[in-house]
Amino acid sequence: MAHLLTNSPIGLLGRWLSGGRLLPPTEQQPGFQLPPPYRLAATRTQPQQQQEQEQEQEQAKPATRPPWNEPQITAEGAIQVGWYSSTDPDNPQNWSFGAKLLVYLEVNLITFMVYMSVAIFSAAEGEFRTVFGVSRSVTELGMSLYVLGYGTGPMIWSPLSEIPSVGRNPPYVVSVTIFLLLSIPTAVVNNVPGFLILRFLQGFFGSPGLATGGASIADVTGLTHLPYGLYVWAVCSIAGPAVAPVIAGFSVPVKGWHWSMWEVLWAAGGCFVFLLFLPETSGPAILHLRAQRLRALTGNPAFQSQSEIAVRDARPTQIVYDALVIPWKINALDPAILFTTVYIGLVYAIFYSYFEVLPRVYITMHAMTLGQLGLIFLGAIVGTLLVLPGYFAFTHWSLNADFRRGVWPRPEKRLVPALCGSVLVPVGLFLFAWTARPDLHWVVPTVGLVLEVAGMSLVIQCVFSYVAVAYLRYSASLFAINDLARAYLAFAAIMWSDPLYDRLGVARGTTLLAGLTVGCVGGMFTLYWWGPALRKRSRFASD
């Protein structure tokens, strides 16, 4: 597994300090020989007689050589650098289970930390409001501005991580380092404006873990196993804000509101250490570096990666247009994408409204402490795990069964679990709304919370899977704009939850939200049945 650290931050640092001796990449290791197809491709500019001698030498070698991949040669004479063979150890898809597990652990840890940092302030809001004498709305900005920051960040970080000359790791390293440094003044600041500005910046620089985490998992995971990996990643995104109130709920009443921010700093420090060992997972980025090394090794400028060949014909204005304009255009002109953006944003906003409504139910009505309230949030994790066996069974016995038969299932088949999930969302909300009463046991509304989060998990997972397949070319940009929409709606939800429940109460306020999700049930079934017709009419859907 040591060779995987070659392109990790610790590997790059070690190689720089050792003058290239420590953890050298494949092309710089002693005894490396250029694969025969690449040698032949490089000699095509040589005299014909020398080419024939090279070919005769290769044909005379034993037939036990590896099944090398033939490099493509463009009309301009560029040799496209790719994977040397189907078993190339530098290809992330060929890494060992242990190496892939390392990527999973580190990406999920970053995701957990960033989401945990959102909700950990919820337990400190009461004391923060008392200490600084500010209104509830100003206090809620401590959470909502963080959410706004991590929704805005992907508009920059996602396109950046897709550039092969950049890759996944630099955005991770730069952003987590800045996040860690920002967490120090955030933990000690003693004025409201400074704290709120720092919280927004924390969210902005924490967003790469959310924006590109799924892409990192996809880099090392085969198509048939990807739904399992992405669901585990989704569990971490729910577990972060669910565990945060438990951590802060027991410590803040004893140590003060600053303690919640110290806990963020410690978590960020742990993530930073683990991040140093995260290998580069982007295939195009790895091949970009390989092409640079081959040019240095052979002195032949014809060796180029596919990204270098493509960028020669790319216009900067077109790149910016595809990244920033096309997602908005698709949302405006494609009803399927518009519905999924609004629906995902709605259920996400409802989830964040829990941080305002649950204290009204469990502290005000059932006289729980902050720590006990934090334990209630763990029901969100139970909800995601509750539907995990069913989702995995559907993926294995239905979706992947088609792949095993050589059949490519239509994208709408990925929405089948979401049909059930879309029903669970309003059922859970209605149950929570009308059982959140002092005369009923607190377990009953908690069951509603569990059901709603279970449904939300299925909906989000299936919709993302559908968009990735049905709109393959624009999926990265669509996910970035979806992140933005979710964050902005969550920001709004945090801010309007208190006025909503002040005016309507818990029962009627939650019923209003449940009613909005009832309409989305019909939208989900419509997308499932009429999705193929909508895609045929779309200018943006994949064939």
Swiss-Prot record:
| Keyword DNA-binding among UniProt keywords | no
Q: What is the annotated localization of this protein?
A: Cell membrane
The primary site where this protein sits is membrane
Q: Which InterPro entries match?
A: MFS, MFS_trans_sf
Looking at the UniProt entry, the stretches that span the membrane are 101-121, 141-161, 178-198, 203-223, 230-250, 259-279, 335-355, 374-394, 415-435, 440-460, 476-496, 512-532
MF terms in GO: fluconazole transmembrane transporter activity
Q: How does it sit in the membrane?
A: Multi-pass membrane protein
Q: Which Gene3D superfamilies match?
A: MFS general substrate transporter like domains (1.20.1250.20)
* Physiological role: May be involved in the secretion of pyranoviolin A.
For this chain, the annotated S-S bridges are none
Which keywords belong to this entry? Answer: Cell membrane, Glycoprotein, Membrane, Transmembrane, Transmembrane helix, Transport
Q: Where is this region: Disordered?
A: 24-71
Q: Which family does it belong to?
A: Belongs to the major facilitator superfamily. CAR1 family.
Cellular component terms per the entry's GO annotation: plasma membrane
Q: What is this protein called?
A: MFS-type transporter pyvG
Query: Where are glycans found on this sequence?
Result: 94
Key word Oxidoreductase present: no
One Pfam family, please name it: MFS_1
Q: What are its GO biological-process terms?
A: xenobiotic detoxification by transmembrane export across the plasma membrane
| Cited CDD domains | MFS_Tpo1_MDR_like (cd17323)
